[in-house]
Amino acid sequence: MILRLYPSRLRGTVSVPPSKSLLHRELICRRLAGQTTALPPHPADDIRYTAAALAQLDIPAPTVYCGDSGSTLRFLLPLFMALGKLDAVFTGSPRLLQRPIPADLGLCPTAAGLTLTRPLRSGTWTLSAAATSQVVSGLLMALPLLPESSDIMLTEKPVSRPYLDMTCRVLQHHGVVVAETPGGYHIDGGQTYRPAPLLTAPDWSAAAYWLVLARVQQQRTSGGTRNDLRVALHDTQAEDTPLSCGVSPGWQGDSIIEEYLRDVPQTVDLTDTPDLLMPLALYAALQPGRTTRFTGCGFLRGKESDRPHAVAQVLHTLGAQVQEAADSLVITGVSGLHGGCVDSFGDHRIAMLAGCAAMLADGPVTLTGGEQVAKSYPDFWKDMAALGGRTEVLEP
């Protein structure tokens, strides 16, 4: 899809979708507890892939298509192994199959996809989570099903640590106990998943785009007090529900990024909150004369795109000052962005970055790959139009 996006001042209230990070985990845990889960209206593509894959647990020799969903693939590989579904073949987009998966799982790449060569074993797993924590989450959900106990030993500090915390808290919600140890986790075997109410939370990584737009619009208003754009956040069903981007669950409203937006620090470490790179980079790009260094970005090169490079390319094309290094981005704010032609790099979060940047630019932006938002936020363009964003489809 090729879109032409025109500078627009957004007005109104937008409701963000539910957290797909939390819903992935709930779909799996509820399935293991014998529960069914109704998907939300217009579910993200990643959620549809996980739901469809779980349905294939009941059929012989399934081909499990994961699309571009790293969560679906890395969460479910250990689960299928634990349940003895060794006749399954996992496949997905070419980019997904290039993303890191530990050799310890014993997968066999074939022309058809990834095949499982052995059941999941209990015992000690020594893993690195420096590139992704998703396989660790997958093991945390699968190992309790085995008869014997297991330990996970992490060889270095994991990235996206709050997502591991989310996994543990969802497991606890379903009666599965995982003990954190100094070097990783201890998991008792022979555990049973317990039915429990569905946990929900807003997708803060999606909300961050609108919150940045609202703040920049407010900054551009005389006096800096008028705010025409508001973000409505769905209430959680449990007080201690973890939030999707890994911040403290007690935060409310726009306080998820308030700390950044109030006074952008010189250095922002994104190791634990990687999905905030795109919206915060846009915000930093529009703070004239201020330089912000985003660190902990190296592992983002193995996401749906090489995200640090994609962010740098999109913002540079639109007039921002960006310096790219192996593990960091350095952005010096400018007074405004201009129009241009950019690409989503096949990445939903880059497409949303480009869309928001276009609203704040001084000329139209042509975006190739606008359909990528369906991966996490299918209604993104619809919501933008409802808020007054002018969009034109040049090529479906």
Predicted regions and their residues:
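Structural preference for solvent-exposed beta-strand-turn elements
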Residues: 1-396
